[in-house]
Amino acid sequence: MKKIVSALLVAGLLAILLIVGGAHRHTVVKPVAEPEQTADGQDEDVPDDIDENLDDTDDVSRDDTDQNENDADQTEDADGMKIGVILIGDETENYSKSHIEAIVKAAETIGIAADDIEWKERIDSSDESYDAVSELLDDGCNLLIANAQVQQDALMDAAEENPDASFVVIGGDKAAVSGLTNYYNAYTDIYEARYLSGVVAGMKLAQLDKKGKISKYGYNKYNRVRVGYIATYPNAEAISGYSAFYLGMKSVMKNVTLEVYYTNTWMDMDAEATAADKMIRSGCVLIAQQADSTSVAETIEKAWKKGRHVYYIGSGEAADVAAEDAVLTSAVSDWSVYYMQLFTALSEEKDFAQDWSQGLSEGAVSITKLGKHVAPKTAEKVKKVQKKLTNGKLYVFDITKFTVGGMRIGDADASVDLTAPDSTEEPAEDDIVKSALTSYDGGTYFAESVLRSAPYFDLHIDGIKEMNLTEEE
């Protein structure tokens, strides 16, 4: 009996210690589930529609030494800010790496110590997100940043329960309608950079076509040049990006078609390499990507080394290094632009945009330095196009430049439901529906990332063929 009593006393003491020890833990409550060309590549011929009398021929690609020249002047005291970062990947893939580098750069600039940033990597499910949020709050983080929409529910729930902390979801789509003053969404206007990269691609294709450098396998049965594109999921983020890229190409090279392969994963190096290899073997002249890893670039570069000259448009700066021969340029986001603004505003306790989106004009997106095999006069052409994009003379999704099912789109086609549910939510009772069509002096365009920052251009425009990786053509 004494042994039993002693055991009960010990068990009781342990229970008390556990209760006391756990009294201050932050637990975010999860909702109950109810989802050939020559090696030099510098032929003298250029497309006939290129202006020959441009005064300014400066390189339009990004030069990091010119970015954020005023950063050094922004050294606000950021004492008291502790940042928790939840990443869908890590430094081995382009997307998360770009956020890591941008957060570190912005933090150093305004004086946030490295010890005041805590990282959670490869958080790619809702359940993992809830756990990561709870742990970061327990550790005293008062600004939580997540870089994927799959993490959105966990941060929104935490924002409701923790009004004194701030929560950011990159690519989230609920800040505009959430009613939460401490919840933020952000996304760059990367579609603008993808359009510019499409112009670069179109210039090269026009050069190759004019010189007779494309094999018969590089054309489809309608005599259109075949270009491949490797995307993640069939969502607005992917559709907006490859549609912009296609329209950029088509603005220079009319007889072009885009073949999109979905890997149906955010990052799978084997799947992405398989998609690239399949496109190369099928005869695609050029391949672009949205997918996150460098395996596409590496696969194309290997083909190049073997004499199979397939050209490449990348996504992120790491791609340029991995495909130094094949790459023409890459579309990139400079997330430090956002994080500098966010950290400064919060440290100074100033109001900040809850649904942030910036692009070429603000330096938030760009294309990288042009590759050594671009067509002649590409820099001049891109500079001219970029100027039009930034001064409102040209819009990526001008509705006169594309059709859907052979028809021009109208308001009904361009309606955006800002309360549309994702795969884990019930539909809202009162939907907030707005038209994305906007008029300007020259016509009408679909205004992407204006009604909210996250992409919503999800129209399947003519000239683009979509397939899952497992499907045969």
Question: Predicted regions: what is each one?
Answer:
Residues D40-E473:
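A residue-level marker of the well-folded mature domains of exported/periplasmic proteins
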Residues M1-N53, T57-N68, T75:
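Gram-positive cell-envelope targeting signals
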